[in-house]
Amino acid sequence: MPPPHPPVPRRILPTIAAAQLGGTSLWFAANAIDADLQRDWALTSSTAGAVTSAVHAGFIVGTLFYSLLMIADRFSPRKVYLVSSLLAALANAAVLLLPEVLLSMTATRFGIGFFLAGIYPVGMKIASGWYQKGLGGALGFLVGALVLGTALPHALRALGTAWPWEEVILVLSTLAVGGGLLMWFLVPDGPYLVKGGASARER
């Protein structure tokens, strides 16, 4: 007879969702301030496509890197999530210190995309460690958090129309750091977390 499913603390799913929302808010951070960059950096309207493509390219490369090296299997997924969140937030804020040229923006966006591979997919892995039963519903909830997270920069820009674009960047980086800290301090490894070919309950 298989052991009963342990109860999942009520905070787990909302905390993972909040952490995912904070981390994925960096995805379209630059798009939300595109008009500001055109004005202050003398960039053209075509830069939004290049910036978005840089994020996607970074995510693809990052996903391959994390997968091929099995980063989330070799190390604690929570630690991977925290470090990835911190590095993505740093890449986002780095644009404030770099020369005001398109290369600076695309390079930092590529970095964000790369480290998002340690946020969104790894967050899903952390959730799967808690929800052997009802995993589909939990993952659906997290997909909703992803959608809200990617829309957050635009909502933030709409609410803070008088804010300098630099403040928008800093707020989004702060949210990403907060998401990483939430995951690290409030979400322990789940009983079904698969690591090294076996779940925690099998070891």
Segments from the language model and where they lie:
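Juxtamembrane helix-start elements in MFS-like secondary transporters
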Residues: L43-T52, V101, L139
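Helix-loop-helix hairpin linking two adjacent transmembrane segments in secondary transporters
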Residues: K133, F141-Y192
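Cytoplasmic helix-loop-helix junction between adjacent transmembrane helices
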Residues: T108-A145
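Juxtamembrane intracellular "pre-TM" segments in multi-pass secondary transporters
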Residues: P2-P6, D189-R203
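Residue-level signature of mid-helix packing/kink "hotspots" within the transmembrane helices
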Residues: F28, V55-L64, T150-A151
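Extracytoplasmic
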Residues: R11-S45, T63-Y66
